[in-house]
Amino acid sequence: MFLTRTEYDRGVNTFSPEGRLFQVEYAIEAIKLGSTAIGLKTKEGVVLAVEKRITSPLLEPSSVEKIMEIDEHIGCAMSGLIADARTLVEHARVETQNHRFSYGEPMTVESTTQALCDLALRFGEGDEESMSRPFGVSLLIAGHDENGPSLYYTDPSGTFWQCNGKAIGSGSEGADSSLQEQFNKDLTLQEAETIALSILKQVMEEKVTPNNVDIAKVAPTYHLYTPSEVEAVISRL
């Protein structure tokens, strides 16, 4: 006799008779509630742009981190549960530093993404009890290594894809279709900044300001834009 749907819902390691892992599917749905993040790859480097939801005028905007540095040549933007993202980013930072220490060279972007997804698939690490649920976060990982610039997208199932452009979060459907229309392989980094921010402006419910968006680039090293640099990109829209 089959278990009820609710019992399949609870078991993170139990497939339903239709071959589905409901907890992973729910985690993927949770990301659609998160703030929108956009990544765009060019020949010069990769641009990341993220919406920051400032829920109260008492909140310090600089404390809301939606783009983080993993290594000097890799950065990542996130949508979903930020605490989960922090766990994954910390793991990736340790992996990249261990690789640099052991081999005397930076870790490739693909290997870093693979290490992140291995952890996502285990739902946690260490000898303590593993997490009882998947990580409720999607990441856009931007990097620059011996293979040139690259952009990867990860989801809670531990799957990753390499992309030229990708949007995640609540406005991802509209943003993805706009990216498809505007992307071409000959974009400059400056054009990519403008496109990413203009698409973000379309899907955001409020006016774009340096306080409610973050922009970063990896070209070839990671750089998070200052509020005045973000203002300069906004003025070009």
Swiss-Prot record:
Gene3D superfamilies: Glutamine Phosphoribosylpyrophosphate, subunit 1, domain 1. GO terms for biological process: proteasome-mediated ubiquitin-dependent protein catabolic process. PROSITE patterns: PROTEASOME_ALPHA_1, PROTEASOME_ALPHA_2. Its main location: cytoplasm. InterPro entries: Ntn_hydrolases_N, Proteasome_alpha, Proteasome_alpha-type, Proteasome_alpha_type_5, Proteasome_asu_N, Proteasome_sua/b. SUPFAM superfamilies: N-terminal nucleophile aminohydrolases (Ntn hydrolases) (SSF56235). It holds the Pfam family Proteasome_A_N. It is found in: Cytoplasm; Nucleus. Keywords: Cytoplasm, Nucleus, Proteasome. One of its GO terms (cellular component) is nucleus. The keyword Cytoplasm applies. The proteasome is a multicatalytic proteinase complex which is characterized by its ability to cleave peptides with Arg, Phe, Tyr, Leu, and Glu adjacent to the leaving group at neutral or slightly basic pH. The proteasome has an ATP-dependent proteolytic activity. The 26S proteasome consists of a 20S proteasome core and two 19S regulatory subunits. The 20S proteasome core is composed of 28 subunits that are arranged in four stacked rings, resulting in a barrel-shaped structure. The two end rings are each formed by seven alpha subunits, and the two central rings are each formed by seven beta subunits. The catalytic chamber with the active sites is on the inside of the barrel. Belongs to the peptidase T1A family. This is Proteasome subunit alpha type-5. The gene is PAE1.
